Amino acid sequence: MKMGKEKKAAVDGPIYDARTLGTPKMLILGVQHLFAMFGATVLVPILTGLSVSATLLFAGLATLFMHLVTGKKVPVFLGSSFAFLGGYFGVVASGAELGLSQAEALPYACVGVACAGLLYLILALICKAFGSKNVMRFFPPVVTGPIIIAIGLILAPSAINNCSTNWWIALVAIVVVIVCNIWGKGMIKIVPILMGVLASYLVAAITGNVDFSGVKDAAWIGLPVAMQNTVFGLFSSGSVNTGLLVSSIIMIVPIAFATMMEHVGDISAISGPIEKNLIEDPGLHRTLIGDGIGTTIAALFGAPANTTYGENTGVLILTKVYDPKVVRIAAYFAILLSFCPKFAALITAMPAATIGGVSIILYGMISAVGVRNMVENHTDFQKSRNVIVAAVILGLALGVNFSAAGAISFAIGNVNIALSGLAIASIVGIVLNAILPGKRDEYMPNEENSGSLGKF
């Protein structure tokens, strides 16, 4: 009788070892965890033109690598990052001016993302050497907040363009996402993006607005990575455009400053519910290494940048199952699905209006997260220096991006370099905050809320 009471208490309270639930329940929890991450993870490759199969494969592999690096102590899933969308779009636009197709230009963007991932390793080394707190003071919310706001605003026009293909289908997605997020209960509240996509996709299919021919022709089993879509394929082609390559790196790498702040916020947020200080053990330097190398490897093989997911925290709070093994099960399922081209074709067939509908909310939420980042960290806009830093970042990021040229271009020798507004704003903002007189604000990660750019 006593054993029965102990077992019931264990189920009702936090669970740190999911094996006590039995294998079937562990598998179900793993599938649930994957679906919580699924909506945003597959939406990024759909928006950018990258491979859905490669995305699932490297989301799973990156998650497993993160767990390996952190000693299997951190219950985190790595999925696709929305923060780099502007970088992908910018490189594709630059490639189009040179006569390159989207498929030909995307590997150049992947080079930039791979380099951005390496920046995580540099920060990890610095954190290990000098301590996380000393490093984060150079990236306070008055810098990262406006950058995040600009990311969302720059992406917003593409969402409207997608919605314009069929506003009724887009509205279904928007309404369902809002209803699930505001009035949903349990797991429904955790996966509003997935619910919005499924509902809108279903309505589009019923009304004849979906072309399933690609799904019919796709094989059930196949390799998730095509060599011609990878960075290796780019360099083996023998026709690399050096100017576009350098521009891609300069355009995309500064975005990592914002996503690294996102990483810190998410790791802090996970620490709260599981009642373990993950910043100290296994250490921020280890989680940064896992995220950074995961992003670099994914990009080299033509998959999007990875990021820690805020939905991850939501699922942990909902289920009270804090065992990292459950997250690893979700990773295994993601890898398994990546070898099914028919599944990827079903995702790719999704109407543009469905994508646009959920993107309106997602892109707006990115900007809202930037605002929240500053509010939660008590950024003082009574200080003139803070107003100037934020104003310059927003002015440069939006002004350059929406100017006639869309970038600031210059030549170094025979190499033409184009800097996006976001890249310029990030660099100038960090420098301004460092040199302007007055007391600088510090980054204070909130343990209850994360600033994820890869989540809803």
Pin down the residues of each PLM region:
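Intrinsically disordered, low-complexity non-transmembrane regions of multi-pass membrane transporters
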Residues: 1-28, 212-238, 272-279, 434-456
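N-terminal signal-anchor module of multipass membrane proteins
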Residues: 1-78, 83-103
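Juxtamembrane interface elements at the cytosolic ends of transmembrane helices
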Residues: 9-11, 38-41, 173-180, 191, ...
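Membrane-embedded helical hairpins/re-entrant loop segments and their flanking transmembrane helices
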Residues: 15-24, 46-67, 251-324, 455
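Hydrophobic, membrane-embedded alpha-helices of multi-pass small-molecule transporters
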Residues: 24-40, 169-173, 191-192, 224-266, ...
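Short, non-helical or kinked segments that cap or interrupt transmembrane helices
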Residues: 50-55, 72-85, 135-144, 189-195, ...
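Interfacial segments of multi-pass membrane proteins
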Residues: 89-95, 181, 312-327, 333-338
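Membrane-embedded alpha-helical modules
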Residues: 105-213, 331-447
